[in-house]
Structure formats: structure tokens, C-alpha cells
Amino acid sequence: LSLVGGFHGRTGRPAQFSDSTRASYRAHLATFRGQEDLITVPPNDVDALRRAFAEAEAKDVFIEAIFMEPVMGEGDPGMAVSPEFYAVARELTEAHGAVLLMDSIQAGLRATGDLSVVDYPGFEGLPAPDMETYSKAMNAGQYPLSILAMTEKAAKLYRTGVYGNTMTANPRAMEVGCAVLGMVTDEVRANIVARGHEFLEKLQALAKELDGPITKVQGTGLLFSCELDPAYKAYGTGSTEEYMRLHGIGVIHGGANSLRFTPHFEVTSAEVDLIVQAVKDAMVNGPRRPAT
């Protein structure tokens, strides 16, 4: 079971559990066809989640795992799972013998300055997931490093020698990860939260000022997005994304038609203003879809 709009990777089962790319993968990759083993529910819909487990049980279907991102990075950038929804997911997986895996690869430290979802504000005291994955910010964006954290219960299922890859347990990767964690001070964590709030406030004000081009602003910490009116093309040739990159802003698209932002952890208020002004410039002076 995964969430509508969720994204978990491009290979193997994580790709199969990725709702946001499932249709595209099926269209182009034969190995993804004929698989009807994924249940999806809308994020933060507690009733739908409970109903999915009840219906599966009634049909004698075993839900082996829930995959979900604490903050979405691809399908609906910046959309956060609520503590209530997480708590119910944890409750149901424990009751049904399923695994709860939190995919924090994109969110990680970027969302609140905390590594694990159970350290996010509002999640303190909730039981940990069975597994949680980290990467991206943990490797400073420079070195191949990903981490799988497990509870003691999940670790008992792990078999040494069965899982691995060429880069596993790489000493240099470990040094990079430790160095990054050492640089994430209390001041950096506070900046992640404060600048995240500032970005949202200023982008929401811009959306109101422009009255139309930006249809939604959402985010958690320094993972946030602006959804654009269909008159604007978020990505591809002749897009808003391309225009902003050519004007010095490293933005990337996400969702159906959104601009996704992941600024560095020590971003300043002056840089916030610069980025917001660049968004305004792109909306006012950048490309639009040809009128039909």
C-alpha cells in the first residue's frame, strides 16, 4: 500500500510502489505490466486507510507493507503526512503484521532539521516505523550514500550476505554522512524551519498579488512548491523551469505542473527574497503555453 502521488524510486519494487510514475512506467516498461498488487489511498485520509485494510482482510489479501513519504518530493512536492495519519498507519501495520517503511530520502533533514519522522514536531512519542530510508541531503548532494535505518524487530529479519551492492558500507560514504550530520547544528535546524516559513509566507503573498498564475503554494521546511496555472508550462522546452534556470535559479519541477524548490540549509532572508523575485519575474516575463 502506498499513497496517491507517492514516489519511491526508479528500480525494482520501490518503482512498482510509486503511484506518481506508475502509469508512465507501465506505458514504456513491460516488466511493470500485469501487476495488480498495489493499493493506494489519498494522503491523510484516515478513513480510506482503515477501509483499505478492512477490504483487504475481507478478501483475504495480505498487505505486506505501507510505503510513504513524510513529505512528498515528486508527486505533490511539500505535502506532509499528518501525525494522525502516521499514527493510524503504524497502528494498522502492527495489528496486521505488515511493515511500515517511511521514505525520507527527499525529506530527511530538509523538512524540519530532524532526520527521522518521529522527531518531527507533532510526531514525538509516536512509535518508530519498522524501516526508514535516508539519502539526498545526507550525502551533501556529492557522494553516493543511502541509509536504511531499522528497528530491532526489523533488524532480526535482516540476513547478512543477502542484501548488498557495490557501494555498500563504503568507508568514504560513511565519512561524508558523519561530516554532514556534524554540520547540522541547532542553528542550521532553526534556519531550515524559519526560512521555510518565510518562503511560504512570501510565495503565498506573491500568489495573491499576481492573482492567477500560481494556484497553490505548499511546503514543509526547505521542501516546497508552487503549482502553476495550466497557462504556464512547468517543465520541458520553453518552460518556466527552463526560464528560471537560465536566469540563475536552480529549480526543478514536480507534480503535474509545479515548481519544486530545495534550497541549501543556510539560505538567508536575502536569498529568499531573490528567489521569490525570480518566481515573479518568471510569471510576468517568462514563457506561457500558446493560446489554443
What are the roles of these predicted feature ranges?
Residues 196-201, 210-243, 265-268:
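Conserved PLP-binding catalytic core of the aspartate aminotransferase-like
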